[in-house]
């Protein structure tokens, strides 16, 4: 019997969870026309190359159709969120209201251990940064800063037309 250490066990679970969510995301997209996806999501569809293109976290992301693979190569969960977004976007304009995927009527990404782990990691990452350091990181990701009651409020243009459920 092979003993699996905690890291590899978590990696296997992580990859299995990703794979289990990637399949339905791609399947949903295959039932939609690329022109319709582009219209509802704010992406641009280049028919001659069969590529959808959109801006996410200050980078231009290209998604091949009908394979629905992203380039440049993105972290798996970023790719998954973009694919679900393309399937769910309904053309709703960006607002300043915070909406989570788990809060959406048909959201495929629900509150989970992953959400909790990411929140914990982000909190740990940011706690070691100065306000100027955080501002530089936000700016590198394409954030726009806005006035609020918070010490720092940044708006990230992660997905252009988020579905409002």
Give residue spans per PLM region.
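Acidic, proline/glycine-rich low-complexity IDRs
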Residues: 1-2, 164-165
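Proline-rich intrinsically disordered, low-complexity coils
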Residues: 24, 34, 66, 72, ...
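Aromatic- and glycine-enriched beta-alpha-beta binding-site module
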Residues: 55-116
């Amino acid at each position: 019997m092979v003993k699996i250490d905690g890291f590899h066990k978590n990696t296997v679970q992580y990859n299995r969870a990703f794979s289990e969510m990637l399949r339905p995301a791609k399947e949903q997209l295959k039932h939609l026309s690329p022109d319709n996806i582009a219209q509802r999501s704010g992406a641009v569809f280049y028919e001659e190359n069969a590529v959808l293109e959109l801006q996410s976290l200050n980078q231009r992301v290209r998604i091949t159709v009908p394979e629905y693979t992203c380039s440049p190569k993105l972290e798996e969960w970023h790719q998954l969120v973009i694919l679900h977004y393309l399937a769910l976007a309904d053309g709703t304009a960006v607002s300043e209201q915070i909406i989570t995927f788990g809060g959406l009527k048909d959201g495929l990404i629900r509150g989970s251990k992953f959400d909790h782990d990411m929140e914990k990691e982000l909190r740990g990452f940011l706690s070691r940064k100065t306000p100027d350091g955080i501002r530089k990181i936000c700016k590198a990701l394409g954030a726009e800063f806005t006035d609020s009651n918070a010490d720092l409020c940044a708006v990230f243009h992660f997905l252009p037309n988020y579905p409002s459920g």
